Structures are given as structure tokens and as C-alpha cells.
UniProtKB/Swiss-Prot annotation:
Source organism (scientific name): Canis lupus familiaris (Dog)
Highest taxon of the lineage: Eukaryota
Phosphothreonine PTM positions: 157, 170, 187, 198
GO process annotations (BP): G1/S transition of mitotic cell cycle; negative regulation of cyclin-dependent protein serine/threonine kinase activity; negative regulation of epithelial cell proliferation; negative regulation of mitotic cell cycle
Residues that bear Phosphotyrosine: 74, 88-89
GO cellular component: cytoplasm; endosome; nucleus
Domain note: A peptide sequence containing only AA 28-79 retains substantial Kip1 cyclin A/CDK2 inhibitory activity.
Pfam families: CDI (PF02234)
Official protein name in the record: Cyclin-dependent kinase inhibitor 1B
UniProt feature, compositional bias: Polar residues: 1-12, 104-113, 175-186
Amino acid sequence: MSNVRVSNGSPTSERRDAKQAEYPKPSACRNLFGPVNHEELTRDLEKHCIDMEEASQNKWNFDFQNHKPLEGKYEWQEVEKGSLPEFYYRPPRPPKGACKVPAQESQDVSGTRQAGPLLGSQANSEDTHLVDQKTDAPDSQTGLAEQCTGIRKRPATDDSSPQNKRANRTEENVSDGSPNAGSVEQTPKKPGLRRRQT
């Protein structure tokens, strides 16, 4: 290490140690503009929200707080729910990390589901809303955390031995012809492209 050349711009280890002892390093989280005045911040936010509401009210001549049209350049008409595309009135999707708890679904120890959620037109009926599911029994909320951890995409296997990526098969099992003996499925290989030698 005696042949290592240290550039003149970098401080020696003695100077670095002395600097660290004199000036303790401040925390990485610093307040650059002084203490936060939460009351002023709240007032500014409320004022900004009111300004945005007024701007959108003037732009669209619609009172968004009371859900009523106003006089102006746009003419608002009430439209029936059935004449709109489905995405305007369907319930919003839960976030990706959220737990899905379908109604009346039970699960056994191995992780297999007993009843699944409604699919297709059954799930999109007008009577089915997220609000209705929330107003069910309050004791269903207690099992929510337990169900979130218990639901699996794949059922648990009964076999405790690890699965091999490639199954070992003997010629006896293959030639046996019985369905149980050679039940392991093998992926066919792609035929290699062979060049003609001329």
C-alpha cells in the first residue's frame, strides 16, 4: 500500500478525523425554512381548494358541492344510467395491495377456496355495490386480517417433499404404459435447425 498515490485534493486521514471530532455531522432531515406553521398551512390549503372549486364552477357552470347545474354556456341534461358506458357507474377497483374479501367465501386449511366471487354479469348487477358489503355484519370485519393472510393464489400441496424442476423417469416407467406409472408430463423440445452441408 506504500505505492498508492493520494491526490492533493483529498484530505489525509488525520485531517478527516480532526474535522469529524470538531463539527458533528447534522442529521440528514433538516428544516430549511424554519418551523412549520400548521394553522397558516391549513388556511392556505382551504383557500386554494375554494379557489379551485370556484374556477371549475365558472368553467363548467355546475355546482359540484350541491350537484346542481347552473346557468351558463353549457346545458346540462340528466341521463339514465343504462344509456351510459358501464365504466361510469361501476365501483372503483381496490388498490393492488388491498386484500380481496369476496362475500360468503370460506377457506379450508390447505388454502383452497370453497366459493368464488361472482363473475361477468352477476357481479355488475345494480344491487351489488361496495357500500352494501360494508354494511353487513360488523363481526365480518374482525376476520378481515385473518382472511387477508390466508388467501392463496395456489392451493397448498399435501406433499412435503420439494418439487424438482425436471422429473426423472426411467425407461421401465415409460414403456409400462400404465397411466399412473408415467403420469409425469414432459415438454416437447423444439426441433433444431440443421444446416445442409454442401
